Every structure is written in C-alpha cells, then in structure tokens.
C-alpha cells in the first residue's frame, strides 16, 4: 500500500473560529477516549464470545467493505454542506476508483441512495451495526483505511452525534491508557458539597470591602475576636459594643507612642452617674426597714406615676421613665426641705435646657426663718445705698454749679404680696434634669408680672441669664420664670365644681362680690361629677387660683396711700403739690368662678373639653385643655383630678407679637433769658461801655463824698 502521505493542508478560507473549535474538538476526543477506555482486568473477565459481540474498543470494522469505501464520501459531503469546504484529492496509492473524488450534488444523491439501500439490506438481514453505533456504551467507529486521512470528521460537530470514543490523532499512540499503566481518569470535575459551597459564598461576601474604607467585615471581625481572646474579659457580651467602637476608632486613629489627652466624659454618662443617687437608699439593715415603714404612711410626695397614667390616656404628659425619675427627684426634694405639701407643676421647655417645676408649701414657721435672712441681705443693700446718697449730697454742696433738681417723680412702688398669700402663696423649686440639685425661685413682685406681660422671651435653661428686652425687665431669667409660673397658674389651675368650698368663717367676712376670699378647703361630701357632664358643660369646671389684677397683685392696694413715716416727712411737699389722691380700685373675678365665664379669644373658646376615649366612655376620663396658654391640661375622673403644664411658657396671641413702643418724648426745658445766647460786642462798644461804667463809678463816688460831708456838718452842729 505504500507509506502514508503527509497531512493535507487546511483550506485557506477556513475562519479562525472554526479552526479553534476543531482543535478543541480533537483535544476533547482524546480526553473522552482516555476516560472511556475499559480496564484490561475487566476485559479479561469477559468471555471471548461476549468480547466479540460486545461493543467496545476491540471491535474493528463492523461495516462491509463497500460501506467503508463510501463512508469517507458521506463525511466529505456533510462537511461540504456545513462549511462549504473542499479537500484536495490525495494520492493514497490505490487504484483510481478508490481515490476520493470531489463532492457534488449528483454524488450526494448517489451516496444517499446507496446508503439507504445498504441500511435497508442490513435491516432485513438482521446484521446491521447501526444499532451498535447508536449504543452509548463504548461503541468504536469502524476502521476505514481511506477515512483515516480525513482529519476533520463532520460527525463530531453535528448536534445529534455522540462524543466519543474517537480515533486517536497521534498514530503512534496505539494503546489504551490502562494498558500503559495510567490510572482510570474521569473527565468530569466533582462538584463541591452544598455546605462547602455555602461557606465559600459567605466568606466571599464578608471579604467585600466597605464603601468608606478599604477594610472588609471579615477583617474587622478577625480584629474584634483577636482583642477579645487577648484581653479575656469576664463578660465578653457586655463589652462587645465598646470593643467594636474602639476597633472602628482605630481604623482612622493609628496607635501613637506619645502621650494623649484622656477622652472627655460624655454628657449622657455624667447624667447617669448623677442619677445613680436617686435609685439608692440611705442606710441598710434594720434602719432601712424602719424608714420603709415610715414611708408607707403619710408622705408629701405625690403619686406621679398615677397622674402620668391618667394623662397618658389623655394623650399628654411625659414618658414613664422620665415620670419615674421625676418622682424620685421629688422624693429627694422632700427629704432635703421641710415640705408640707408637694406637687409636680409641669415642665417649661427651653432653648438649651428645660425646667422641671415643683410646687411646694413649707411647714408652719420654716419659711419665716428663711425670709428673715433674705430681708437682712436686702436691708444691708439699702443701707449701703443710703450711705452712698449722703456722700453724693455732700459732694453736691461742695460743687460750685448746682444742677437744678428734676421735678419728675417716679411712680410709687407697689409692694409685693406677702408669703402664703396671693401670687406668693406657694414656693417653687426648679431643676433641669432629675438628679440635679433643686433651686428655689424667689418671690414674684408686681413690677415683674407687669413687665412680663409686655415681653415674650424664650428660656435658655440658665437661671442667671439676663433678660434683655424693652421695656427692661427688673431681674434675670429666674425672676422671669417665676412671673410666668404665677401667670400660668392663675389662668389654668382648674378643678371640678364642688371639689373645693369656702369655709364658714370666711363666709361671715365676705366682702362685696366675694373678691376678698383667698382660701378654700376640700369638700368632704364631694361625690364626683359624671364624665359626660364634665365634657358637655364648662360650668362644671371652676378656677381655684386667684386672678392677678392689672396691678400685678391678687389683692389691690392704693399706690398713693402712704405710711405714717412718709406722711410726717412729706407734709410740706404734699401741701405744695396737692392733687387728686383717689384711684379707681381694680376688681377681678372671685375664686371658684366657672370656666364658662371666661372671655373669648378672637371668637375662639378659651377652653376645649373631650373624652380620653370616645369608644368606651364609661371608662374614660374628662380632659380639658387651655387655648389661652397652650400646654396647660387638666383631667378629672370621679374624685380625682390634676393639672399640668408642658410648654414654652408663652401666652397665645391671635396676632403676631409686637414689642412695646418707646415712651413719648418729654417736653424740653422752657427757654428764658438765662439760657439765651448773646452776640459778642465790638471793640467800640466795649470802650463805650467801659467809659460809661467809669463815669457811673465817679458819679457814685462824688455822691458818697457829698453825703459824708453833710453827715460831718450835722455832727458839728
């Protein structure tokens, strides 16, 4: 037959992609051939007859000689149909009838007819090897001496063709891998287990870097766990959050070997340290038990948690945590001060800090001692002022030019109300947060109340802050806060009708209109008012705090009425300046006046009532809200009621606030000759004036001499 010819060159028109796919198909055919090769030991166990009939690598040409001669032409026809490639004729040393001929449409039809007839013949004989080729288990293609030169088998690229086993590309490799001593190799890569795959995916997710920095969550967790294992804290879970913050802080602050300042304590931590004292009891053992027994009895500390519960139903009030801390703070206040009654008045909001207000009443005799100390301080100041005035008068006497005294007299100072009466009936303590020290507010004066009505200022939360306003306010923020508390209390402290009543002794001393009554007492026969009646009519609610007059007091005083000392000192002045001393007396509404008599605010009702829950009125509470002072609320349920204020301390005004205008301009000093300006004289006028003065002086001297001579003559006679 001769030597095998060299491999034919590939056609020039074949695209690169086709060459790449064909090369990969050849590599894949080698791998599949190696993977599907049978083990020699297993082949030895099969009987010889079974080995001849079984489909395997040992079988060689199962087609007839005529079929083998026609198969290369079929492959070339299929190759030409798919890719349009034509192969050059190759001289294999066989006769011309066995040489591969160029493929054409006529030859295609002939080959198809011949193949069909051969397949039908084989099917009739029952010896067809077509089913053996379709068998997927280790079927070897037949040996074709002419087809071995066709390196590009088209059946490898068809969709329905089974891949492998294939003829080896290397003619020198004529043995199976198992025959050469290589172990059995499977071409399929084993897939990882689901758990291992999930772990790999989770780790890849944790290794993603953050947007803000180049670190990943995996690295952060490694650093965090390393710190915990190195430090070995007693309770790792409790310090996990702080360690996490420290680890994050170290990302942006590298460790330094120099001295650093200690971190400042956070305000929240400071406040928590101060509030620790509220949750501790002084003493222990039997002493603590005795104190507990004493506290179980009567105590001036109110039940703030019960009040907070009712106001919570009304939709107002503070949180339960803050209410409980306020309760403990007021308990601390009662232990520090001689308090007879105590009540949580409310909370006034501020720009920087807020005020918690406690309304208290001291025991009898305790407040007088403190007032005496305050009076001594004020008297000392007055003495210093008087001494300064005396020194000023002496300086004025020594002065050459005496300034004329002003005729204007300041308006008389209205005295403040005494303790336990009027606007100063109760004492007020304030603090910014529960646990901080309580500060007592001073008594309010009428001038402070009058000026507080003319200004509107936000509170800062610091009592010593000056109040910058016009008209000027006489005091600092502590005095302004006290004045606003007095105004709010007088207008919003209400109670159900019949809860309070006047005593019988005051009934005999009642003045006209009942304006002189300033005290009341609880009615023991009060049974409560149904909730629906409290909501329907405002006449079932009354004011139990005295009204503040325009003068700034609850009880009116005559500002022109003087004491005996003032009358003795100024009798002569009064005679010179006699004027009308009669001033119209101011009268306000009496105590326990119904809310239905309150004046409207620009056609707006001053009060609004509602039920806490309209779906279940039998278990609801009546709630009344002030429209004049937003933030003032009151509730009533049976024999219980309470008032509270939570707001900015400002009165509602339908119009925008306008500050007071400056005072009217005073009259100028009357013009007269003593203040008239004169024109300067000329030189001639000065000389003429001088000559006239000398002449007048000479005339006076002559007259004096003549008078002296006449007197001498009379004496001689």
Swiss-Prot record:
The keyword Cytoplasm applies. GO terms for biological process: axoneme assembly; cilium movement; manchette disassembly; sperm flagellum assembly. It is found in: Cytoplasm, Cytoskeleton, Flagellum axoneme. Residues 1-65, 503-523, 563-588, 672-717 are annotated as: Disordered. It comes from the Eukaryota. The keyword Cytoplasm applies. One of its GO terms (cellular component) is sperm flagellum. InterPro entries: Radial_spoke. Residues 503-513, 564-585, 700-717 have a biased composition (Acidic residues). Keywords: Cell projection, Cilium, Cytoplasm, Cytoskeleton, Flagellum. Phosphorylated by PKA. Phosphorylation increases in capacitated sperm. Functions as part of radial spoke complexes in the axoneme of sperm flagella that play an important part in motility. The triple radial spokes (RS1, RS2 and RS3) are required to modulate beating of the sperm flagellum. Belongs to the flagellar radial spoke RSP4/6 family. Component of the axonemal radial spoke 1 (RS1) and 2 (RS2) complexes, at least composed of spoke head proteins RSPH1, RSPH3, RSPH9 and the cilia-specific component RSPH4A or sperm-specific component RSPH6A, spoke stalk proteins RSPH14, DNAJB13, DYDC1, ROPN1L and NME5, and the RS1 complex-specific anchor protein IQUB. Interacts with RSPH1. Interacts with RSPH3B. Interacts with RSPH4A. Interacts with RSPH9. Interacts with RSPH10B. This is Radial spoke head protein 6 homolog A. The lineage of its organism: Eukaryota, Metazoa, Chordata, Craniata, Vertebrata.
